Amino acid sequence: MGFVEGEVEIQQPGGSWRKASEDQSLAIGDRVRTLPGSTARLEFPWTAIAVGDGSEVALQNQRVLTLRLEIGRIDIDPEQTLLQVVTAEATVSGSGRTLVRREGGATFVGSYNGGANVEAKGAIVRLGVNKGTVVKTDGPPAEPLAMGPAPKIIAPGADPRYVKVAEAVRLKWKGPETAYHLEVLSIDSDVPVVSIDISALEYELRLPWLGTFRWRVAGRTGPVESEPSGEGLICVVEK
């Protein structure tokens, strides 16, 4: 567990759910879940995975390192090539920054860099840059389609907003969807420290860490997400 923000729990085989902590080791068979408004980061020697809020994942005992997504959303670092993700509907492998979201008996896979492979019912599709596919129960992957148009951020934008630790900053954007996914990332990482679903066009964010952060949003309709927006900047200072 490389990072824990909010309420994150871990369950070992045969055990009960208990509070997770940063730097806690994970073993095959362990399960991790995030409560609403919370984010976790799973770190491996060659990659990292952001687990969005309201999600549950499990490390499976397979020949290839396998992470099972039961529900919710994960965002896989671009450097990954040795990890596969499975859901009840699909198997995801390959390379490049990839998001996998499962809800309502369907799995959506989006590839930001290209290179993700999605397999179901004996059929395989390879996703290009900013392409996505949906896999429904007992069906093959749908033909890859371009991810929808990105929302537009309003504030803060390219000019950084300076705030103190835990001071509120209101994020605003516009787009046609009624639901969105918000990500906040440190300036030097592609793995989010905040990864949450929102049903609004603004959000009051409080960051407990010093440093410079980027934020972006993607529209969502069910499990399907749009391209992410451009990025705004937030600088958290001591005073």
Describe every region a protein language model picked out.
Residues 9, 181-185:
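Beta-strand signatures of extracellular beta-sandwich domains
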Residues 224-236:
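Extracellular fibronectin type III
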Residues 167-177:
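Conserved aromatic anchor
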Residues 193-199:
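Short beta-strand segments within Ig-like beta-sandwich modules, predominantly Fibronectin type-III
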Residues 1-159:
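Flexible, surface-exposed loop/linker segments and immediately adjacent secondary-structure boundaries
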Residues 161-165:
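Short, solvent-exposed loop/linker segments at the N-terminal edge
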Residues 204-212:
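Surface-exposed, short loops/turns at beta-strand junctions within beta-sandwich domains
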